[in-house]
């Protein structure tokens, strides 16, 4: 049996656009009255707009650097980490002494991070997106990623059930260059590492191309690549999330949260070590979806992408191919194989993100700008997982190619 998504005809286009606009308007009004913290929802919406408008991402930029040696995306990530650290390091060190309760994404440096990030990197490569990228695709109505998201929830929930095992693995404890040493020394060390990595990326691209695509472009009116502005805005938005919610931007914890809410809806017993570990057992499970800070920013991101997406449709009359084309959701052996592979890789991403204390957002971005060493371990392990997966995939394709 086939389930197919169809694009509407041109004659009914304007009417449906008007109905969609009304639906979005009423939905936003309802959300504004229902959410526990409207500020976090707005910040999430802003994140979605920035990601979509500037075509910013993580997984795609990493893949591009590894396969094509085009590093402008990864260099924009380093800029993001530099700007974020300038904002986070002094704040994490000084604000608590002034009576402001803020905490960084600081986690132990352990085998669970090494293994979890590697698993996430493998899944991210096969799916073609990370957690934030999945939310972005959902906002752009790419239906495949709703299926991916479902399996990320399943994988994250299974990881929650087994979290006590992962937390018993060897660990070196926590260390943050923002709070465990004078923050200004830590910031200088952080920026020095960023500068060194930036130089290595430049050399990596120069080994393939005569010239390197610059982040500062004289042909642009602002003399900057749009990725620079995106990095600046994302760092500021993450900092505002820290000030509003007392914790940096994160995504991956919504996977076990939604899974446990689903299990509760089915009246199944829950007594898992994961919720004891994060110290949020009763509080987290008692919070509604619209009262949870991580849920709000994640929901806001999907809404923000949708607003930016449909704004482009209304202004330019262009829709992405995944909406405008007719697509078969299920049918035939290839579709079944694709669904099975997507389920496995989505579950890998959800599982890996939870046991590694985060995804590209919570583990990589927020972890590193909080000065936590586990963030750097997360980055290198996820990159290793992606690199090996791409290498194995290339070898597999070459063996299947006709002589």
Which residues fall in each region the model found?
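Membrane-interfacial helix-loop segments of redox and metal-homeostasis proteins
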Residues: 1-403
């Amino acid at each position: 049996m086939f389930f197919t998504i169809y694009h509407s005809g041109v004659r009914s286009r304007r009417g449906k656009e008007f109905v969609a606009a009304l639906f979005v308007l009423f939905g936003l009004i309802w959300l504004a009255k229902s959410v526990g913290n409207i500020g976090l929802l707005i910040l999430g919406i802003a994140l979605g707009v920035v990601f979509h408008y500037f075509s910013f991402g993580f997984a795609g930029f990493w893949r591009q650097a590894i396969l094509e040696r085009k590093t402008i995306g990864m260099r924009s990530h380093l800029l993001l980490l530099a700007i974020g650290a300038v904002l986070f390091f002094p704040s994490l060190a000084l604000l608590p002494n002034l009576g402001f309760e803020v905490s960084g994404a600081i986690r132990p440096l352990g085998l669970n991070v090494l293994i979890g990030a590697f698993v996430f990197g493998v899944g991210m490569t096969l799916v073609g997106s990370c957690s934030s990228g999945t939310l972005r695709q959902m906002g752009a109505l790419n239906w495949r990623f709703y299926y991916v998201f479902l399996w990320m929830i399943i994988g994250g929930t299974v990881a929650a059930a087994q979290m006590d095992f992962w937390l018993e693995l060897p660990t070196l404890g926590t260390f943050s260059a923002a709070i465990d040493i004078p923050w200004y020394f830590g910031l200088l060390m952080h920026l020095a590492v960023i500068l060194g990595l930036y130089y290595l990326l430049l050399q990596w691209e120069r080994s393939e191309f005569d010239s390197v695509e610059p982040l500062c472009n004289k042909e642009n009116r602002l003399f900057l690549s749009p990725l620079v502005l995106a990095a600046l805005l994302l760092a500021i938005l993450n900092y505002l999330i820290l000030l509003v919610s007392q914790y940096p931007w994160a995504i991956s914890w919504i996977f076990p949260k939604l899974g446990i809410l689903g299990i509760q809806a089915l009246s199944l017993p829950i007594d898992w070590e994961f919720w004891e570990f994060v110290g949020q057992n009763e509080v987290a499970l008692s919070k509604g979806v619209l009262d949870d800070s991580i849920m709000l920013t994640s929901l806001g991101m999907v809404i923000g992408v949708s607003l930016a997406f449909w704004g482009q449709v209304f202004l330019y009359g262009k829709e992405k191919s995944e909406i405008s084309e007719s697509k078969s959701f299920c049918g035939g052996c290839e579709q079944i194989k694709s669904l099975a592979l997507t389920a496995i890789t989505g579950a890998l991403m959800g599982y890996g993100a939870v046991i590694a204390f985060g995804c590209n957002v919570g583990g990589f971005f927020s972890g590193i700008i909080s000065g936590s060493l586990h963030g750097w371990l997360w980055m290198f392990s996820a990159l290793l997982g992606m690199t090996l997966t791409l290498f194995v995939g290339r070898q597999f394709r070459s063996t299947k190619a006709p002589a």
